Amino acid sequence: DKENAGLLDPFVIMKNIEDGATLAKEILTFLTGISTRDGEKFPVLIRAIGKVKDSEHRGLLNVIAELRKEETVIANNIADHIESFVDYDFAQLLFSDGSVENAISLDNQLNIIQVADLVLPDKDTSFEEYTTIELLSVAMLIVISTFALDFIHSDRSIFKIVDLDEAWAFLNVAQG
């Protein structure tokens, strides 16, 4: 659904800019498989995320744009890799250019996050065996879980409930 595009972008869903950048790092390293131990790719990705964090328009699509600006083989390969996920209709929730207005907010009394068609891997499936849809589903699970924790820890003077419908699906995944 085009009207929901980018709602789960880490830069959009997190209230704190630093938290958004941290979650963006987690999501993009998860999706691309770039390890913190990769001395070539990891610094390039982190630098691009940092530039987006410091910009006016924050969104994962802008990380791709920042990588392209570097005009290096490594940066272009990382940009291509991230962009390959954007082509999935399902992934539209995760990627924005930072112009999303209908954002999910910690200040709302009620947030309903319903993601249809999540395909979560079996608990026994190794990370290397995840399909692309499973990777994207787990990435969304990570974003939703991080938002839920942020919601729980915000303004503790207000009573809150987080209801995870069909939580068994979340709990059957290693990341859940």
Segments predicted by a language model, with ranges:
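P-loop NTPase motor domains
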Residues: 1-176
